[in-house]
Amino acid sequence: MANALLARTNRDADRSPDFKIPVKALLTLCNAAFRRHGAGEFAQAIRIYEQILAIRPDLSDIHNNLGHALAALGRPAAAVTAFAHAIELRPSYPEALCNWGLALAELDRLDEAEAKYRQAIEVAPRFAGAYNNLGLLLKATGRLTEAKRAFKQAIALAPNDFSIYHNLAAVRPFSAGDRYLTALEAAAADPSMLPATDQMHLHFTLAKANDDLDRSEYAFAHLMKANWLKRRQIAYDEADTLGRMNRLRELVSHDFIRARQGCGERSAVPVFIVGMTRSGTTLIEQILASHPHVFGAGEHPLLDQVTGSIQKLLPGAPTFPDMMLHMSGADFCALGSLYLDSLMERSATALRITDKMTLNFLFVGLIHLALPDAAIIHAVRDPADTCLSSFSTHFSNGNEHTYDLAELGRYYRHYRQLMAHWHDVLPPGRILDVHYEDVVADVEKAARRIISHCGLDWDPRCLDFHLTERTVKTASAAQVRKPIYKNSIARWRKYEAFIGPLLAELAPIAE
């Protein structure tokens, strides 16, 4: 990559004498940046990219790479600036246009993001990635028919990119004789030539297709292959993950809470929706976001980020949860204030703003102390249904515990033990449990409980949640565009014969 980059940019240098530097020195910097970037060392890569640009600000590829690294570090606003520089230098640069769109989408500037994807298609009509990104945005905004069309166009241009088939599968069911299913089955007949990631997407998609066709045995065989392939690609420290949950139960006692109460930021704006993935959190947020005084902010790691900011200020920078032992009342208040400032950047006018980062169940004790007036809603669903749905999903990031049945069961058990602990040590009524099955059985009754818990007056628009136009970036993006349906309840039963390791781990908490 570095040699190709320099071949292009040094032609420009011949016309711009001020930019001439020894090629070898620039090549060394570029290679160092690319190595860091490829290894996921984004902060180090950014520093080198900035060095390069200080010498050669005319390199559009380096601006693009800088933007990519900034976005990977959770700095989409800075990434937007970098991509804008890349396009200023090279207007017909489809990859940078797509990356620009992704960063804009992360900032919820969706109209602008869509425009960048369409601009990328205009300058490169055969760029499958642009159609795929456009499809994902259309799916997130509920324009499912348009999303299908975009994914189909992407597949026509890149028929061997099985991640696109996976995206298409999320917005349409498969049927017998489906031409896309035929293509997938042909690829699965001899997957040995495919990279592991392509095989993984292929098997996740075939699992969905066979589930659509009620071929449970075939579906689960593909699901096992997909998860096995994914599990081999990731690092998951189970002892550390479960140990943190155990440490929270040990550390945050009744006495711990009592000694620190009354010192947080007083605001009722935040509404935390916590729980396991695939437990109904998106449905709860969609109901809330249909209320005129609520803004649904979706999943953002805001609480984790501000907790990290406070941690760095404490003597010795102790990690969570032990950092809570070293926090003063002022620290809890500062954490709550920092979080509130970040949250309200999403909406300055809403009376309530939801935070649907499911992993915030780890922070419930911290939330209570730092934001004592914030609502906390816990989404609960049948354990086996929750876990099977997670096992059936390929997550774009995180959720490393979901790719092995036994690990998933152990994680779920520890999560439920921690939630029971929060109920025990916090004041009665502090956490509202909302069971998915209860929402399905009587959506109005459940919705009224949710709205009341958030201190809002009832609004009938909450019952038409499937009509609410907003962005949903989770795996449930297509489902929440439909009215309530019941076919996800007890879905695990048709896979009971295959999920023994999961059921064995769940047995101690069987309901």
Regions from the PLM with identified roles:
Residues 367-389:
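Conserved phosphate-donor/acceptor-positioning beta-strand/loop module used by diverse small-molecule
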Residues 263-369:
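Phosphate-binding active sites in nucleotide-utilizing proteins
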Residues 150, 165-169, 181-193, 202-270, ...:
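PAPS-dependent sulfotransferases, especially Golgi type II membrane carbohydrate sulfotransferases
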Residues 29-32, 36, 48, 62-76, ...:
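TPR/Sel1-like alpha-solenoid repeat signature
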